[in-house]
Design a protein with these regions (language model features):
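N-terminal intrinsically disordered, low-complexity tails enriched in polar/charged
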Residues: 1-11, 171-180
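C-terminal cap/substrate-recognition subdomain and adjoining C-terminal extension
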Residues: 71-182
């Protein structure tokens, strides 16, 4: 007897700016300055360890205007392999609502978590009770913290149970059995 393959890990979509690269972090908060693509980027080595820990439960993916550049510039500094990425830098660049549609398309029905500093409150309300979607906002001045990692690890999104249709009749409600020919 063959067993079914294990279910795929939920996806974890990560923004860079405001999440891994906080806006104006406190001095001495463990961030190192890097000059990348003519911009100054602050990264914490703790994030690399946390993301590797999360990769045991999740399939990581970039959801950032950095797009493929995140693999070239950010991943090596955090000790991460190349990750899949979602195109979030198009026409709606800078509009968080515009980032959500490409994430939904990429997830293609798989459970996922999205960590971003600009998740619209309307989306937070809309998906608050879903077991297959976790939207985790991060304060852009602080970036990703251990409490966010703990939340992601404690209750990862899981596939929603799907009904195979309306329940069938109860045994007492079923049609009588036909008589055997006598």
């Amino acid at each position: 007897m063959t067993s079914a393959p294990p279910p795929a890990k939920p996806l974890l979509y990560l923004d860079v700016d405001g999440v891994l690269n906080p806006v104006c972090p406190r001095p001495g908060s463990g961030y190192t300055r890097h000059r990348l693509l003519r911009s100054e980027v602050l990264l914490s080595s703790a994030h690399g360890g946390w993301l590797r820990e999360l990769s045991e439960v999740y399939e990581l993916a970039w959801a950032s205007t950095w797009e493929a550049w995140a693999n070239r510039c950010i991943a090596p500094l955090l000790g991460l392999p190349d990750l899949p990425w979602v195109a979030c830098g198009g026409v709606n660049s800078g509009a968080p609502e515009g980032d959500f549609a490409p994430i939904m398309r990429h997830a293609a029905g798989r459970p996922f978590a999205w960590v971003d500093d600009l998740i619209p409150p309307r989306l937070l309300r809309r998906y608050a009770d879903r077991s297959d979607v976790l939207l985790l906002p991060v304060e852009p001045g602080q970036g990703l913290r251990r409490r966010h990692v703990d939340r992601l690890l404690s209750r990862p999104p899981r596939a929603a149970r799907v009904s195979s249709g309306p329940p069938g009749p109860r045994p007492s409600e079923s049609a009588p059995s036909p008589r055997r020919p006598g």
